[in-house]
């Protein structure tokens, strides 16, 4: 069964398993997410649920969004996201999806916006090699060859060059759910997940199962 939830990355810590081994984990506040709309094939051309997550002051939302929440009978939220799930009949408008939809040991895919690094050179952005650092060399961290000379007389598209790094949608696949703390809506994920602390993340069943 497909499952999905929105959450907020709180940070990283470490826990110990029953054998005393240290496991680095990312703590995610997953939900509660409120169902605010059910999309159907007859009306919308596809099936999906629309969920909302995170509190926000009502004055910060415009009238169309306020009306959308009022129609569902739900208080205004910060984030809205659609998920395509298999069994829409089990969910009703106004119902909350909490962290306990997942279980320890499950595998999930987590999506978020990666940390922005600004304008970076090829060494940091693409892990390129440096030039000689010895005395007399004038080539240390420069780009190097960007292509041939008179033919083709241009630099090909997608050539790895300096530019903006980070701040893009990123998905990490097949991460393990180490622990669920349902009373606090917390999910502990083994390893790191994309984005900064307090960043929005999406948690779904892994496609690699």
UniProtKB/Swiss-Prot annotation:
Described purpose of this protein according to its UniProt entry: One of the primary rRNA binding proteins, it binds directly near the 3'-end of the 23S rRNA, where it nucleates assembly of the 50S subunit.
InterPro entries on file: Ribosomal_uL3, Ribosomal_uL3_bac/org-type, Ribosomal_uL3_CS, Transl_B-barrel_sf
GO MF annotations, alphabetized: rRNA binding; structural constituent of ribosome
Record's GO cellular component terms: cytosolic large ribosomal subunit
GO biological process, alphabetically ordered: translation
Keywords associated with the record: Ribonucleoprotein, Ribosomal protein, RNA-binding, rRNA-binding
Protein name: Large ribosomal subunit protein uL3
Organism (species): Clostridium botulinum (strain Kyoto / Type A2)
Gene (name only): rplC
Domain of life: Bacteria
Region (Disordered): 141-163
Family according to the record: Belongs to the universal ribosomal protein uL3 family.
NCBIfam families per the UniProt record, alphabetical: L3_bact (TIGR03625)
